């Protein structure tokens, strides 16, 4: 993560608070590097199932280098080289790829893979799993595909009412969650679930990933000091959307999600002295720097980085690419 250029003095009274940590997490870094390394090693095209990460800039940049993004493995030609996205896939997707002799490289975040293994383990132990997540998200689809019969989606507190009645009498009941949710919202859902299902068990460890939690804590640390929060991230990025919600819930008067600096509306600045900036876990730092430069045009030329945690986690590349270093 490159450091922001910090002006030596406040010239206008207008200020930027820059949340840290922000941007790329270890899982995203690994996934993007997997596609880049595959392109170097095998040449273009490299097919990628779904968006490798939920960021428009990253996807467009990789496409320019020779990645071809498809919705399903079946759309790639026989024997193609394919990377599965950071969000993880179900066993059925692996089977579809194998049926076409596709050489698949799984770039699933290891923390998502951990949840897959938990689902498999609890299924074998006879548990029904209440999976807290957002319907239609690739991570949710991939995870639930590891236990189709015994995993039940809970999409928000409202989703509790849609759960099947037989679960009321199910003694072996446990909850798990998508890795990119709001920590506070997830705990609220768990509390409501335990009202309806007193027998509900907690998992051995929290599934919400370290990067998601750290970025939410970093936003909380500055939100109360900001009239406006700008989160850099794509609208299909669950963790980026959650950062906007966290900012609003913790003191920011307004919060907006932007992919690029050009999307910023100067009307947002009316009456605003302090602007907070953060970015989702799939956002490269170059996009944050673009926002800082854009705000400087409007007099926000004093930048203070507020650090709430240090991140040193690095994930190894998929095994097939490790010897290519």
From Swiss-Prot:
Signal peptide (from-to): none
Claim: Translocase is one of the keywords in the record: no
Annotated catalytic residues: 139 (proton donor)
Pathway(s) where this gene product acts: Isoprenoid biosynthesis; dimethylallyl diphosphate biosynthesis; dimethylallyl diphosphate from (2E)-4-hydroxy-3-methylbutenyl diphosphate: step 1/1; Isoprenoid biosynthesis; isopentenyl diphosphate biosynthesis via DXP pathway; isopentenyl diphosphate from 1-deoxy-D-xylulose 5-phosphate: step 6/6
One GO term of the biological process aspect: isopentenyl diphosphate biosynthetic process, methylerythritol 4-phosphate pathway
EC number(s) given by UniProt: 1.17.7.4
Top-level EC class: oxidoreductase
Superkingdom of the source species: Bacteria
Residues the record lists as binding isopentenyl diphosphate: 54, 87, 137, 237-239, 282
Chain sites annotated for binding [4Fe-4S] cluster: 25, 109, 209
Details of cofactor binding: Binds 1 [4Fe-4S] cluster per subunit.
Residues reported in the UniProt entry to bind (2E)-4-hydroxy-3-methylbut-2-enyl diphosphate: 54, 87, 137, 179, 237-239, 282
Keyword Lipoprotein: no
GO molecular function, one term: 4 iron, 4 sulfur cluster binding
Cofactor names: [4Fe-4S] cluster
Transmembrane region(s): none
Reaction(s) catalysed by this chain's protein: isopentenyl diphosphate + 2 oxidized [2Fe-2S]-[ferredoxin] + H2O = (2E)-4-hydroxy-3-methylbut-2-enyl diphosphate + 2 reduced [2Fe-2S]-[ferredoxin] + 2 H(+); dimethylallyl diphosphate + 2 oxidized [2Fe-2S]-[ferredoxin] + H2O = (2E)-4-hydroxy-3-methylbut-2-enyl diphosphate + 2 reduced [2Fe-2S]-[ferredoxin] + 2 H(+)
Keywords from the named record: 4Fe-4S, Iron, Iron-sulfur, Isoprene biosynthesis, Metal-binding, Oxidoreductase
Residues that hold dimethylallyl diphosphate according to the record: 54, 87, 137, 237-239, 282
Recorded family membership: Belongs to the IspH family.
The protein's role, per its UniProt record: Catalyzes the conversion of 1-hydroxy-2-methyl-2-(E)-butenyl 4-diphosphate (HMBPP) into a mixture of isopentenyl diphosphate (IPP) and dimethylallyl diphosphate (DMAPP). Acts in the terminal step of the DOXP/MEP pathway for isoprenoid precursor biosynthesis.
The protein's name: 4-hydroxy-3-methylbut-2-enyl diphosphate reductase
Source taxonomy: Bacteria, Bacillati, Actinomycetota, Actinomycetes, Mycobacteriales
